[in-house]
Amino acid sequence: MAGAKEIRSKIASIKSTQKITSAMEKVAVSKMRKAQLRMAASRPYAERIRQVIGHLAKANPEYKHPFMVERPVKRVGYILVSTDRGLCGGLNINLFKALIKSMKEWHDKGVEADFCVIGNKGASFFRSYGGNVVAAIGNLGEEPSINSLIGSIKVMLDAFHEGRVDRLYLASNKFINTMTQKPVVEQLLPLAASDDEGVQKGTWDYLYEPNAQQLLDALLVRYMESQVYQAVVENGAAEQAARMIAMKNATDNAGELISDLQLVYNKARQAAITQEISEIVGGAAAV
């Protein structure tokens, strides 16, 4: 059994770590709430663009933008949204597993992939796993800007437009609630037909200038950018929620470990006192 002094030192060390994890939990709660607000603020913009695109496409069925045309798949592209930092449980690992599953399905069909990586953890993953990374960006901070993402997104959109990739996916974590984050791999391009009720009913009657086709060309690019930005913001909220849970579990585990060590310390101290008493009694008897 370890000595009382050694156990005391270990308890003090764990208490110090517990204070750090507790503070990190509180910081994560605050950051998660801010990320949720950003997520809620950006969603209406993306939804409205989607509705307008759906209306434009329905009103001009003869015009087919390349982003809306299905074609035989010879190569696919992925935009991966990961975190810049760790200490967020299995958030990134679960996302990488979902991505690898999708990649394997295409690889089995003889289809290779290109990647755009957002976040340092994703870049680290591809350094060890391998893959054709054509664009990468990291260190976006707590409040990512869509302007920071446009360059990397454009690389993948141009690749699709020029026929270098035939299908484009977005891999990120969905923020379901504080306790649940879900890794998803969703198809970005070609864009699926809208199932929005307002679009299907055809209740809108707008005039578009300079013309509907030019507007559709511009809006489709903006929509793709907004979808990726929304994924980055939502992934940020999922990251903070996962970090909050991880730090709470670490704090709770530290508390349990301290209790166990305190019990061991008390037993060690009791054994030491008992031994001292035995030695005193033995010495007195010898006299």
From Swiss-Prot:
F-type ATPases have 2 components, CF(1) - the catalytic core - and CF(0) - the membrane proton channel. CF(1) has five subunits: alpha(3), beta(3), gamma(1), delta(1), epsilon(1). CF(0) has three main subunits: a, b and c. Belongs to the ATPase gamma chain family. This is ATP synthase gamma chain. Gene3D superfamilies: 3.40.1380.10, ATP synthase, gamma subunit, helix hairpin domain (1.10.287.80). It is found in: Cell inner membrane. The lineage of its organism: Bacteria, Pseudomonadati, Pseudomonadota, Gammaproteobacteria, Pseudomonadales. InterPro entries: ATP_synth_F1_ATPase_gsu (IPR035968), ATP_synth_F1_gsu (IPR000131), ATP_synth_F1_gsu_CS (IPR023632). CDD domains: F1-ATPase_gamma. GO terms for molecular function: ATP binding; proton-transporting ATP synthase activity, rotational mechanism. GO terms for cellular component: plasma membrane; proton-transporting ATP synthase complex. Produces ATP from ADP in the presence of a proton gradient across the membrane. The gamma chain is believed to be important in regulating ATPase activity and the flow of protons through the CF(0) complex. Keywords: ATP synthesis, Cell inner membrane, Cell membrane, CF(1), Hydrogen ion transport, Ion transport, Membrane, Transport. It is a peripheral membrane protein. Pfam families: ATP-synt. The keyword Disulfide bond does not apply.
